[in-house]
């Protein structure tokens, strides 16, 4: 009897996991299709009905996940912040030092590069998005996470110079990804770059730059980085 009961419980758990996985897949598909339509015809010109039609689902099925376009845009930010929160939690569990700082920056680069489409959408629609209630609070939501990332990189009670370098590394990663991964016309890109970098090249360069900065920051925080006085 116990064996049969356990088998039923196991099947129920497996079914729930499968259902949750399907929900997550559908949500991700909605986000991807919404991004495609927003890029093709603009955020304001895109309706939920068009998103549902592109997906091949009813509006009711779409409403189960998102009640409005604003909800979809909010989900982009929530997902990004959720990944940052997980990264910060991971970093706080690691021993402080250059290796942890490098690994955290490496993981941060991954998050930013995988969020490229979302960043491009937010950049193209700044006026519209920033006018929403969520848009107004986006940076205030990012600031405490930036402070937490900086603390993981430098350690607690780091000197101001070290914290500024940490912030510079974080912003350099996100800004560089937004610029070098942008789908700008070739003529415009050729004016500033001999050849567009591949994602692998961009990732390697960013990691090298961030690693150099993080190594200096860790030494500076521990008092091991010399400072040449002004003359």
Name these PLM-found stretches.
Residues 29, 33, 37-71, 75:
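Helix-turn-helix
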Residues 78-85:
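Short, basic, alpha-helical segments at the C-terminal edge of helix-turn-helix-like DNA-binding modules
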Residues 85, 130-167:
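Amphipathic alpha-helical packing segments from all-alpha helical-bundle domains
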Residues 75, 89-118:
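Hydrophobic alpha-helical connector segments
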Residues 1-8, 147-156, 179-231:
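C-terminal peripheral helix-coil segments that are non-catalytic and often amphipathic
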Residues 103-107, 121-124, 164-172, 205-208:
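Amphipathic alpha-helical interaction segments
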Residues 2-14, 88, 103, 112:
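Metal-dependent phosphohydrolase cores
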